[in-house]
Amino acid sequence: MRNIEVPAGVIDYDETGSGPPVVLLHGLLMDHTLWDRVLPLLPEGFRYLRPVLPLGAHRHAMNPGADLTLPGQVRLVADLLDALSLEGVTLVHSDWGGALFLTARGRDRRVARQVILPSEAFGNFPPGLPGKMLALAARLPGGVRLAARQLRVSWLRRLPFMYGQMAHRPVPGELIRRWTEPVLTSPGIRRDLVAYCRGRFDKAALTRDTEALAGFHGDVLVLWSPDNRVMPAAHGHRLAALMPRAGYAEIPGAYVLSMLDEPAAVAHKMGEFLTSTPAATEPGQGQHRP
């Protein structure tokens, strides 16, 4: 793992390959290993970067006073792309939808293309039953640690309010242990996660920020899982309709974490998109234009 400093703190990231950059994101209580099954199946000729965002499975607590609410996390992603001096980025969203708001914030200059797997969007923050349960746990004393310990019990994490609605296939225990270790052992990591979960989620403002994607002019693949119950199927179609150069495809049978349920299908669709649409040849290709 490499790391780089941004104003909020130190961010770890994994990097492999060379060529136009592809940045693969993740959701709460997950890290870069979410993409382990897909990464070897993606086409060569690209530089794949997998940052570990401060969403609960990170290894370095952020700086005291860092803004880790949703707006702060959006800035952090933009700051990370700046710190890495990336141009013509293909940004891949999964589960956490915060980085969709780079356009609304005027911080998408480095983003040329996007791939949007089932993610929070419009007013669906926190998403579905699992998201609302984690938000509730973050407001209770000791709630985050209790939730993390429960996730380590295989039959409990298959319940709908845990991972039962996130992945169709059982999530391996070794992944769960890795993802929950930081919040179980580090008060600083718990503080960071709680700071995000206790932030304000204004559904009207979130919907407006999502709709700002109409100003994104790069190529987009919305790769939705219509069988999931957490990110509405209608949101996938709505996202694709928003952006002038967006296409829509589906991964049947998968839930939110389609890269775990159907890694070969996800890699195939992503690979087709990466190799059939040109990466940006100059900075700002995907930038919001008035």
Descriptions of predicted regions:
Residues 227-231:
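Acidic catalytic loop of the alpha/beta-hydrolase fold
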Residues 1-22, 43-47, 82, 86-87, ...:
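Alpha/beta-hydrolase fold catalytic core
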Residues 254-263, 267:
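Catalytic histidine-centered segment of alpha/beta-hydrolase-like enzymes
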Residues 125-128, 151-215:
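Conserved alpha/beta-hydrolase catalytic His-Asp/Glu region
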Residues 216, 222-224:
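Short beta-strand/loop motif that positions the catalytic acidic residue
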Residues 16, 49-96, 268:
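Active-site loop/oxyanion-hole signature of alpha/beta-hydrolase fold enzymes
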Residues 87-129:
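Conserved hydrolase catalytic core segment
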Residues 14-60:
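Conserved HGGG/HGGXW glycine-rich cap/lid loop of the alpha/beta-hydrolase fold
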